[in-house]
């Protein structure tokens, strides 16, 4: 059942109770029909034992709008949480779904008490609730998401150790070096309840050596450990050097890389939450446990027009803006599976007083990190008047449009903007929001040491890479 303290659980007395069960692999499709005041019915389709399973209808339809939210399980997408608004004892007024890749529109009307069904690092595999002429309440079944184990890389020898994967994040890493290489690695974690875990040391603390400055990771500020570069000696079987990268910074190279074979632990879209490996007098090899990184929806500020949502992509390649006194049209060129995909919102107006400006990024060596905008608010509707774009290379576009007094900012520290959503009509852009996702710093950006390694975005395959 839901593990969130704000969950709107089985508290209603009215309506017929229903239960889809908890023996599914995943949720695949959700159909919602809404009326003037509340959600009328919901239907959920699942995958069970690898086969599609059609769900039952819960509630009653008396006309109204129908929306469908599809989850692509074949691409490792899964349902993380459900949020919405309700009138306790009566009905659910609005509902919204979030996966590990994207967030649906809010379906319905945002009146009443807010509720949330979520459980940290778990996914939804089933629902239950009650309904008659309306959906009256909703609760969810959760199952844990098993972290992926990346096999240990480095030299041979030593005794096996394993810190496990039952952690929320890595918070501090410190190494001691001697003439052979890494003498020990000291690791600090935060558990799933947010409490500091026991410090773990692997290797030897005896004999001469030099303890280096620790590398600290601020998990409270949404900093995540994303990748590790290591170098080992094939003869001695000892790791010679290590370097760590988060979505915000890169450590100095800890050790000697002059005579070592390189390996990398990383996986696109994942963070490292635990370690295992082999060690005795020195650190011989290092492996990791990884889990999915969080996707954040940066909400738009404003109202008017029609809702649109591009979803998420690998990155943004180009932005084109058409404007005069207002932003008339915005065009995004995204990268999806290595191919370019274009989305246009508004109409490309070619008139004497309409200007066009474009901003091109050097993808995959550069990504979009922030959008600043200004807007006016005539007659209760917002209209965007200017936009400015910033990148991971510390480049800023020219202002596109004419600045006004009210402003907004779409930005999340250490993250790239990988998709957009908003409000528009054929002749105005009313509001703009974005999706943000943690990304590895690129070469030359926020380095702590000029001798840092190759940098760049992580590899596409989830595994260990030897060079």
Give short role names for the model-derived ranges:
Residues 1-467:
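Lectin-type carbohydrate-recognition ectodomains
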């Amino acid at each position: 059942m839901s593990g969130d303290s704000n969950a709107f659980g089985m508290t209603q007395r009215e309506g017929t109770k229903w239960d889809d069960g908890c023996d599914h692999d995943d949720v695949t499709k959700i159909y919602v029909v809404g009326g003037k005041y509340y959600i009328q019915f919901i239907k959920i389709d699942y995958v069970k034992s690898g086969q599609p399973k059609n769900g039952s209808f819960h509630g009653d339809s008396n006309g109204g709008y129908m929306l469908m939210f599809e989850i692509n399980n074949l691409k490792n997408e899964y349902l993380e949480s459900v949020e919405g608004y309700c009138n306790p004892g009566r009905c659910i007024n609005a509902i919204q779904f979030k996966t590990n890749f994207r967030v649906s529109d809010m379906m319905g009307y945002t009146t009443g008490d807010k509720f949330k069904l979520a459980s940290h690092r778990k996914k939804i595999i089933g629902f239950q609730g009650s309904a008659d002429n309306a959906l009256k309440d909703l609760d969810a079944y959760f199952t844990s998401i098993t972290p992926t184990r990346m096999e240990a890389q480095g030299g041979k020898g030593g005794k096996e150790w394993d810190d496990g994967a039952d952690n929320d994040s890595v918070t501090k890493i410190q190494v001691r070096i001697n003439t052979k290489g890494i003498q020990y690695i000291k690791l600090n974690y935060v558990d799933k309840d947010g409490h500091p875990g026991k410090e773990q040391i692997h290797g030897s603390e005896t004999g001469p050596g030099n303890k280096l400055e620790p590398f600290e990771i601020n998990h409270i500020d949404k900093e995540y450990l994303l990748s590790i570069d290591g170098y080992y000696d094939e003869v001695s079987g000892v790791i010679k050097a290590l370097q760590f990268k988060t979505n915000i910074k890169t450590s100095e190279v800890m050790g000697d890389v002059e005579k070592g074979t390189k390996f990398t632990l990383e996986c696109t879209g994942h963070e490292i939450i635990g370690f295992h490996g082999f060690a005795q007098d020195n650190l011989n090899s290092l492996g990791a446990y990884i889990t999915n990184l969080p996707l954040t929806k940066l909400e738009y500020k404003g109202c008017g027009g029609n809702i649109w949502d591009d979803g998420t992509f690998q990155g943004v390649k180009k932005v084109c803006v058409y404007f005069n006194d207002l932003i008339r049209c915005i065009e995004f060129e995204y990268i999806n599976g290595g191919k370019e995909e274009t989305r246009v919102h508004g109409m490309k107006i070619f008139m004497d007083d309409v200007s066009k400006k474009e901003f091109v990024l050097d993808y995959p060596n550069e990504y979009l990190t922030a959008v600043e905008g200004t807007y006016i608010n005539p007659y209760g509707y917002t209209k965007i008047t200017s936009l400015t774009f910033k990148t991971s290379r510390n480049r800023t576009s020219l202002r596109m449009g004419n600045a006004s007094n009210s402003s907004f900012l779409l930005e999340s520290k250490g993250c790239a903007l990988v998709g957009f959503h908003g409000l528009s009509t054929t002749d105005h852009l009313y509001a703009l929001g974005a999706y943000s996702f943690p990304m590895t710093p690129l070469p030359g950006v926020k380095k702590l040491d000029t001798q840092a390694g190759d940098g760049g975005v992580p590899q596409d395959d989830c595994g260990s890479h030897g060079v």
